[in-house]
Amino acid sequence: MAGLAVCGHSAQACRLALVLALDVSNSVDADEDALQRNGLATALLAPAVRDAFFASDAPVALAVFEWSGRHHQRMMQDWVLIDTPATLEIVADKIATTPRFYYEFPTAIGYALGLSAGLLDTAPQCDAQTIDVSGDGVNNDGFEPRDAFLAFDLEGVTINGLVIEVPEDAALWAGQIDLTTYYLENVIQGPGAFIEVARGFDDFARAMEIKLVRELGVLMLGQNTLLAVGQDG
């Protein structure tokens, strides 16, 4: 896409390298996926998020991918330095219009974290690194997220979660750990790690906006945020 430069190690220093990982496992139907993609695009262009991106002279590097099974991940946006509002608009449009690639595979959160770790290895030099995993289910394919912390170099990396709580799915997990607790105990880690909760895919854009603003360094009212165990709000 014209005017959008992919950045690498030689790019100017940035304050944050941010990886966004979107769940496209088989529990996410086409309508829900559209709400997720359009929700992320909407959140990126929300005034509060725009302001947060450009609140500092040091820019943010962004990469986005979709994930499902252990061998089923696909880049939606490789590393790009968000250094102008025009670049942010191009990225948002690309996310909204990129077609879904995988439909029928399970939920491999550990492998999504592995890909994220590899992406951070190719990111420009930044003051901090954050992985943001969105999902509507627990890991059911491949190694667990906690095993990824041992297998990949994620020391000092903040891993946040956007939990999509779908009411009709809750009955399927009756008697099992709830999704928010699962993410708190198994997915998030690192400095300042937190979870933002979306009450269904219709709520994804709101939750993503709040989470992005917080990740970019600003707190917002109206958030459904839970911190990792042992952290203070």
Regions found by a protein language model. Name each.
Residues E104-E155, G233:
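Exposed acidic/Ser/Thr-rich ligand/metal-binding surfaces
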Residues E196-G233:
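C-terminal "exit" segments of structured domains
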Residues V138-E185:
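VWA/integrin I-like adhesion module and closely mimicked acidic/polar interface patches used
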Residues C14-D78, I82, A86-S134, G161-A171, ...:
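Von Willebrand factor
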Residues D33-R37, A41, L45, A61, ...:
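Extracytoplasmic/secreted envelope proteins and their assembly/folding machinery
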Residues P47-S56, P106, P124-Q129, M220-N224:
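Surface-exposed patches in mature extracellular/periplasmic domains of secreted proteins
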Residues A21-D31, L62, D78, I95-P106, ...:
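Second-shell loop/turn segments in exported
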